[in-house]
Amino acid sequence: MFERDIYTIHSTYREDMHIKGFQFGKGEKSACIVGAARGNEIQQMYICSQLVKTLRELENNGCISAGKQILVIPTINAYSVNISRRFFGVKEADINRSFPGNDYGEPADRLTNALLTEIKDYVYGIQFTSFYRPGEFVPHVRMMETGYQNTSLANLFGLPYVVVRKPVPIDTKTLNYNWQDEMTAAFSVYTNQNSQIDEASARQADPVREPFRLYQSCII
């Protein structure tokens, strides 16, 4: 396992925010998993922490295929997690509505631009996320209808159902949409909790513990 900084936001009045990634294996960029983009996505961050633990054990046992790389980013919004606020910064920006961003914009735009530049070349992209409205959810996979979506692959998560959504203009600012626009097979995974941990749904959503066949390209 190799821990590296994906992007750093410098601050005058508080500690810098480092977006950290955990890389397993070397070679082709096979799969990238992104966790909490909003400050209340504790469940999503927890799933990524368990995923890092599992992948580290697999790597130590020589079970990561040669020439394959997996990257896990547990959170891209540690500032909001630390102060228990859903959105980012004084302008309350929704990170998952700020893609693809740009290098000369607001902090949220610079963050998403740097992140997408780092992760856009992966074959598979998985985002653990929450819906933009409050509600109760059965764990499921959701993706945008861009012409690049692949519901057959989404079914391999083994979750109860897959939702394909026709994007409206605001959806074009999401990570899922922009990942697909970069030709990454992107999947958004929803569980039934956000701000607290639910072990059962966390295990159900974990793509290594559960029979997600895409990982056969990365893991023996």
Mark where each language-model region is:
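Structured catalytic-domain cores with a bias toward divalent-metal coordination
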Residues: 1-220
